[in-house]
């Protein structure tokens, strides 16, 4: 009978000493399996060998798969607290059998394997059915005649050796017709359609059970590398599911918190030292929380902490400190750089440490998957919490998502939990961006997927809607709610701001939007306007030169002689809006220059829930720009609040600063701030609201 041992012929006492692991873990790792020694060793690096049908058949016996499943489960229990030091890294000992079983799954999968019983996914594949004569239909394509699927082997891995494809589609650059193709000019400039997997394989191969099962096992593996190509594969997976309508053919993809194997500086007392857990060296924080290390969240003064008494017969320090500090166990480990949830350093040297913003904490039981746990959490408003959200709230989760340890975790976004919308805000539903191109086209089509949008105005300093994420500036006076299908770019376009503004006003998204894929959540509110920004005006009203109060929000450039305003609603077009207010489209465009000459900008700048001028003295009906009292035409784009007596404008260029711009235009910085209130008193808003390619007032009477 075939037998496999991980460490055959080596005395267990020597191994235990060499590996510095418990004897129980070593016994579990070195258990005898009913598998061929050579073939099972090959399974530990399945893609490093060329498998024949005979090899796979000899390995994939019921006895081998059953003993492999038992081995995996036994090591998960016996090695839960053991680490191995190899290749300069520390990693959980239980990952050793995990990699073997992961390879076994790849070698043994057939078109008839029940993936829900796969040991690497959820249990065991022992009961999977293998049909001796199972085949998969051959792929056909007039352009891909070489892509034939083997009908000899029942094993998908062996079949896959006959799946011939291409990494990308390359145009024939010798053909003069393709001489201007971007891909021929720059081979690295590959359009998305030329690297889409669905375009690289014919549908009958792409949608075959073997192709789907192999693809699923690879991206569901807990050992999927954390590289860009893995992200590409996951994106392609969901595309393939849509094309093949195959969601019922494979389990849902389990979202895991990627493991990070720390560098290995050494071990002591059964715990690797602090560096092993990825703890950076603590730097002293000032007692007031201003430090030589920036704390972006809570500064905790250790001398002021007064935690509850701990009953060590039934509790651990972590059991008490996590609810006391309203932080996850993993975050407290990170704060103290100690898995005992208590500091082991001198308070006088490091009096203050940094901890994330507070969150609601709940105890996560051991051996619960993230997906299972998240499914038990109540919704936030009408939005179900996702595993991706949960992982973003718990960046220091202890363990991986399909094998967690008992710990406290955040079940709300650090920095804020759900509250009912406040009563001092005005909420409107409907598209935030109007449609229409001047020809009567209805608004409402520019939201993502044509769905409705929610935007909310908040008085400066007022309570924002909820839920939001941390870091939004207090001067934000306009919020918008993201919904399913939104991306950072489309969301910013829908609300008339740039992607850079969205990322600046919502720091959680990253300075260059690098966190948009992981931190941009449906159901959450994001800042889309600051007080005085070009896309947002304060809820306090101003008065036009006719004495008529100016409502909010409005866009820039409205005729200062306006005598009447009206709010656009979802479904309006420029023409319909003009007709409903008993004016001509020409008057609407004249009094609201943002809509463009002849309504050329109606498709992009006519927004639901914004106010537009619908009444002005007859003398201004033919004016397409808002004249100042000195008859100087107002250029575009400008920001709100500019002195109506402005006699001169200048355009800011990339790299300009407020003081430099003022000097360049022969005025003082004080004058610049006075004539352009959006820049704030003393230029307080220059860093956020002084934009290149915008016009600012640089001349006024008496200057």
UniProtKB/Swiss-Prot annotation:
Residues 538-549 have a biased composition (Low complexity). Residues 420-485, 538-559 are annotated as: Disordered. Keywords: Chitin-binding, Repeat, Virulence. GO terms for molecular function: chitin binding. Residues 432-450 have a biased composition (Gly residues). The LysM (lysin motif) domains are small globular domains involved in binding chitin in eukaryotes. LysM5 contains 3 LysM domains. In plants, chitin acts as a microbe-associated molecular pattern (MAMP) that is recognized by lysin motif (LysM)-containing plant cell surface-localized pattern recognition receptors (PRRs) that activate a plethora of downstream immune responses. This is Non-secreted LysM effector LysM5. The gene is LysM5.
